[in-house]
C-alpha cells in the first residue's frame, strides 16, 4: 500500500466510495494517494463492472483500490483479471475465505497488494494468519459485515487495536476507516502520526456516493496538499464552480 507522498505527516490519504467521474478526477488532482472503488452490491456506492472500468480509465492505475466482499474466492481473481488492478481491499472475510482467496490467487499467478478490513475486536485478527496482506484496515461492522456503517471507532479503541496489529508477526501497515472527515483529523492529530493510512468516505459526502467537493478541499488543505489547486471563490456541495 506504499505510495510516494508529501504532507504534514507521513500518512496516506485514501478517498473511498467514489462513484462519480468528477469526484474521481478531483480526488486525484487534490493529491489523494489512493482512490477506493466499491464493487459490493449491498453498498449504495456500488459500481457495476462497466462503471468500474469507466472510473479506472480516469485515474492513475497505481492509485486504484477495488473494494470487494467476495462470496466466492474466484470473484477476487476474476476482478483482478478483468481490470488489471494492483490493489484490492477485502471485507467480511473469514479465515476459511482467506485461505481460499490465497489459493486462487496463487493458482492464477496474481500477487496484488491486499488490504483486509477487520472490526476493532482482537479475535478478528486471526484472519491475518491465513492470507498475506500488506495492510489491515480497522472499520466498524454491523451484522458480521465490515464497512458501510459510517460509524467512527472510538479513538482509544482504534489506537489500542493499532498497537495490537503492530505486534503481529506479519507487521502489516494499518489503516483507519469509519466516518472520518476533516474534523476527525483536527480533533485527533495523533491519527496523522500513528496510522499508515486514513480512509475517508461518508465523512466527506453530501449524500451516499456524492462527494462534497468543499469538504474534500478542506480535508486536503488541512493535510497540506491540494495538488496545486487554488480554493475556488464559490464551493457548492458536490461540485466545484
Swiss-Prot record:
Q: What is this protein called?
A: N-(5'-phosphoribosyl)anthranilate isomerase
GO:BP terms for this protein?
L-tryptophan biosynthetic process
CDD domains to which the protein is assigned, alphabetical: PRAI (cd00405)
> Which molecular-function annotation in GO is an example for this chain?
phosphoribosylanthranilate isomerase activity
Keywords on record? Amino-acid biosynthesis, Aromatic amino acid biosynthesis, Isomerase, Tryptophan biosynthesis
**Has UniProt tagged this entry with the keyword Isomerase?**
yes
Catalytic activity as recorded in UniProt: N-(5-phospho-beta-D-ribosyl)anthranilate = 1-(2-carboxyphenylamino)-1-deoxy-D-ribulose 5-phosphate
Instruction: Give the pathway listed in the UniProt entry for this protein.
Output: Amino-acid biosynthesis; L-tryptophan biosynthesis; L-tryptophan from chorismate: step 3/5
Matching Gene3D superfamilies, A to Z? Aldolase class I (3.20.20.70)
Looking up Pfam families in the UniProt record yields: PRAI
- Entry EC number(s): 5.3.1.24
Family note? Belongs to the TrpF family.
